[in-house]
Structure formats: structure tokens, C-alpha cells
Design a protein with these regions (language model features):
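Disordered, low-complexity segments in secreted/periplasmic proteins that are enriched in proline
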Residues: 27-47, 271-273, 331, 445-487
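Beta-strand-rich domains and repeat architectures in extracellular enzymes and scaffolds
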Residues: 65-77
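Surface-exposed loop/turn motifs in large extracellular/passenger domains
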Residues: 42-61, 75-97, 101, 105-126, ...
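Extracellular, surface-exposed repeat architectures
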Residues: 416-438
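Bacterial N-terminal signal peptides that target proteins for export
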Residues: 2-12
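Surface-exposed loop/turn positions within long extracellular repeat scaffolds
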Residues: 377-383, 396-406, 419-421, 426
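C-terminal motif of bacterial Sec signal peptides marking the signal peptidase cleavage site
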Residues: 20-24
């Protein structure tokens, strides 16, 4: 892992501004260019002397900077490019949040139109509004970045950004964002694929989870920490997979008045049009999930499958629950609960679950799982099915109320409490056979979004329902001016 303090900055002789325009798909760049015709203020500076550093250090030999609103320091447009041992600095703002968040306006490093951009041993610093650090936009576009450090300080300025079907592959990065609505690992309209292996990812701003997913995002062997927001947010028909990850979340500030709850992981559908409707997915294998404030999981206005296998889960908030599936301000009132399929494999899990009267839970315990907690201790009437495989167990910590149960004679330990199954008291030591609750993978209603998250959907959808989600392709014509703040 890179130590930020070990990045070397050396004395240098300022070179003349170097401007090169990215041309055909066959052209290849080699890391000494500021490659955007639109980036007229990008400059490159040589580092004339070098200092040998350790294996974890980054040796900087060139600097590229850009201070023009809306422009890039580096742009790869339909070509294969490689850069290494650079420091990239971006200041300036974007006039349009949509242009910046959807299409890469004002990002420090931008790849588009099927480009393949490889970055290694670089430092990226941005200080501007809507100044994302590294952006992959469009089908066929791939950014590969390794052994690098990214810092963003402005609002709405993520570390890694992927939209429009782009691909981002990251290895051993250190990313730190301090602005509001600035996730370390971000996606937006049109989604894409993000693969992260190794590194450290930290966010400090309000509305700045470590991961905000409207894509398929996989992170392995990494440390992730949010000091103000959720650790992970998944919106709509998208996914986050964590393998051997240490995730720490302290959601202690509100980015919206649509929900009163705090949580480590939020899974929802905003109805903004930025994420397709359908089944959201959260998978975590190994590693740890530590929550400092509120609940561990919150699901609202969407259907989701959550799979946890051999994860150490700690909730430091004694008043928080493990899972809350409930209505909030997104979607249509009365039809915007959470619908959850929860799979626990080889888990020791402690924590209560709350499923409100318009929400649904199917919980499956397998592979020697022990769950200690209460489900709907206040009898809030949500539909709940529990299935306990032989060798797994549910230990009650309070009276609990569920709809249906499948277990063998050893699957339930009442522990002095009462379990009601569809209103009938369960007798410990008996078998039970029930049926899962059908979950339909669609969200309900149209709703605005929290400040810093996607806004209202476009008008013109039939019957008051959302239309097809945008593909992420840039619309024709001039870009919109202004635009709402984004996540």
C-alpha cells in the first residue's frame, strides 16, 4: 500500500507548455503529454533531478496541470495511452453537474470512445467543484490504474468515476476525498464495470460513501472507511461485491431529509433515472464490516439480494439494528418498502431485524450459521420467511414475529423467548416447513433524490411511471447549464 508521505516531489525546470491533441484509435501516447485539444491550459513540467525511493514510494518525473473550467489535464479519446511517474493537478469547476457526473466534464484524467488508458505510479490532486480525478466513459473504454495516489478536495469530486458502460480496473491505490458528495469509487448514469484490488479508500464528506454504485463494482483485499457517510450505497439494478475487505462506516451526517436512519450500507432506488430498476445485489465474503452509528443495512424502495459469508460484523451502536427494510422518502408512499433476500453462510451474526408492514424478508441460514437476534420484536407485520439449514441455528434474544418458517428440530433456540409464526406460537424442538415470500424486482413511484444524489427523472414517462433508464450516451446538442448537485 502506498504511503502518501513517501511521494517524492523534486526540484524541476519548468518546460514550455506542451499541447498535443489525441487523434486516431491507433495512436499511442507515452506519459509525457497533456493530450486534449480542449485542455488549452494544460502544462507539463519536467522534473530534472530524481531521488531513489523505496518500493512503496512514487517517483515523480513529470507534472501535468490544468486550471481551465470544464477541461482535462489528460484525455485519451479512442486510443491506447500509457502514463507513469506523473503528478496530475486539476483546478477549475464545471458549469454543469450532469456534464461532469455523466460525461466526464472537468475531470482531471478522462478516457472515452473506446480508449485504453493505462496509468501507473501517478499522483492525482483535484481542487474544484465537479472535479473527478479519473473518469472512464462509454462502452469499450477501459482505464487501468495501479500503484497511485488520488486526493480530491472539492464537492462532487470522486476518486474513480465510471459511466456510460465504461470499465475501470484499479490496483493498490490510495484514495482520499474530503468534499461533500464525493465517493472514492463512483459510478453514475449508464453504469459500467469497476474492479478494485488492494489499497486504501477514505471519504470524509457529507453524502460521500466510499462506494456509490450504479454499476457492477467489485473490491478485493482493500481497506475502506467513511467518516461521515455510509460506507456503501447501491442504487437500483446494480451490484457491489466485497472480497476480504475491511469496511468501516460512521454515517453521522444527513444528506437528505427523506430518511431518519443512519446506516453502513444503503440499498435503494431514487427514481432519478440514473439507475435501472430491478434487483440490487450486495455480496461480501470474508473481511469485516464495522458500523459506528445507526443500522448496518437499510433497504428502501427496491428489491435486493444480500449475501454474507464468513464476515466479521460489528455494530458499535447499541440502538442500531442489523437490518432495516422500511419505507422512507423515495418512491410512492405505501408501496416503497424494502424487499430483501438475505443469505447467511458460515456466519456468526448478532443484531435485530426490522421489517415494516410494506416490506418483505426471506432469510436463509446455512453452512453452520448462528444468528442471535430478534426479528420484528414489535410485531410490525412485515412479511418474513426464515429457512434454517441443518447445522445452522437462530437464537432468539427477544420475542419475534415472522410469517413462515422452515427448520429442523434443532434450528431454533428460543432462549426464554417466544417465536410467533403466522400468529401461532412455535414449540422448540419441532420441525417446520414453510414457503418463501415472492419478491418482485421493481421499485415504486417517482421521487426526487437527496441533495448530492441523482435528481428527478426526466418528464414524459407514460402513466406516471419512470421510463427506460438512460443508456449513458451523451445527448446531442449543447450541454445543459447549471444542473443539480450529484452524489
Amino acid at each position: 500500500m502506498i504511503n502518501r508521505k513517501n511521494i517524492k516531489t523534486f526540484s524541476f525546470i519548468t518546460a514550455a507548455a506542451l499541447m498535443m491533441s489525441v487523434a486516431s484509435c491507433s495512436k499511442s501516447n507515452s506519459g509525457t503529454e497533456a493530450s486534449s485539444a480542449s485542455s488549452e491550459k494544460a502544462t507539463v513540467s519536467d522534473k530534472s533531478s530524481r531521488e531513489v525511493s523505496g518500493s512503496d514510494d512514487i517517483e515523480i518525473s513529470k507534472e501535468i496541470s490544468n486550471d481551465e473550467d470544464g477541461a482535462h489535464a489528460i484525455e485519451a479519446d479512442g486510443e491506447t495511452s500509457e502514463y507513469s511517474h506523473l503528478k496530475v493537478t486539476k483546478t477549475g469547476d464545471s458549469d454543469s453537474g450532469d456534464e461532469a457526473d455523466f460525461y466526464g466534464d472537468n475531470s482531471a484524467i478522462f478516457a472515452t470512445n473506446g480508449a485504453i488508458l493505462t496509468l501507473s505510479d501517478i499522483v492525482v490532486d483535484t481542487d474544484g467543484t465537479h472535479a473527478n480525478a479519473v473518469f472512464s466513459y462509454g462502452d469499450g473504454t477501459t482505464v487501468n490504474i495501479s500503484n497511485s495516489v488520488i486526493t480530491t478536495t472539492g464537492n462532487c469530486s470522486g476518486g474513480l468515476m465510471t459511466t456510460g458502460g465504461g470499465t475501470m480496473n484499479a490496483t493498490d491505490l490510495t484514495i482520499h476525498t474530503t468534499g461533500n458528495s464525493s465517493a472514492a469509487i463512483r459510478s453514475d448514469r449508464g453504469g459500467g464495470t469497476v474492479n478494485v484490488d488492494g489499497g486504501s479508500y477514505t471519504t470524509d464528506g457529507k453524502g460521500s460513501p466510499v462506494i456509490y454504485s450504479t454499476a457492477d463494482i467489485t473490491v478485493s483485499n482493500a481497506v475502506m472507511e467513511s467518516t461521515s457517510s455510509q460506507g456503501v450505497v447501491v442504487e437500483g439494478k446494480n451490484s457491489v461485491t466485497l472480497n476480504n475487505v475491511e469496511l468501516i462506516a460512521d454515517n453521522n451526517t444527513k444528506n437528505s431529509d427523506k430518511s431518519e436512519y443512519y446506516q453502513a450500507v444503503m440499498i435503494y432506488q431514487s427514481m432519478s433515472g440514473d439507475a435501472a430498476e430491478g434487483l440490487a445485489t450486495f455480496n461480501m465474503t470474508g473481511g469485516s464490516l464495522t458500523n459506528a452509528n445507526g443500522d448496518v443495512f437499510f433497504v428502501n424502495n427496491t428489491a435486493t439480494t444480500i449475501t454474507l459469508e464468513d464476515v466479521q460484523i460489528v455494530n458499535r451502536d447499541a440502538d442500531g439494528v442489523f437490518l432495516r427494510a422500511a419505507a422512507a422518502g423515495w418512491g410512492s408512499s405505501g408501496a416503497n418498502g424494502g424487499k430483501v433476500n438475505l443469505y447467511l453462510k458460515d456466519q456468526d451474526l448478532i443484531g435485530d431485524m426490522i421489517v415494516d408492514d410494506i416490506s418483505t424478508l426471506n432469510m436463509y441460514l446455512s453452512s453452520g450459521t448462528t444468528y442471535s437476534g430478534a426479528i420484528n420484536a414489535d410485531n410490525s407485520e412485515g412479511q418474513i420467511y426464515v429457512e434454517i439449514e441443518s447445522g445452522s441455528k437462530w437464537v432468539l434474544t427477544e420475542d419475534s414475529y415472522i410469517t413462515s418458517l422452515t427448520c429442523d428440530a434443532d434450528g431454533i433456540e428460543l432462549n426464554g423467548h417466544t417465536l410467533y409464526v403466522n400468529g401461532v406460537e412455535y414449540t422448540q424442538g419441532t420441525t417446520s416447513s414453510g414457503e418463501a415470500i415472492e419478491i418482485i424486482s421493481e421499485s415504486s413511484g417517482r421521487s426526487g433524490s437527496p441533495d448530492g444524489m441523482p435528481g428527478d427523472p426526466p418528464s414524459g414517462s407514460p402513466d406516471g411511471k419512470p421510463g427506460d433508464p438512460p443508456s449513458g450516451e451523451r445527448p446531442e446538442g449543447d450541454p445543459p447549464k447549471g444542473g443539480p448537485d450529484k452524489k
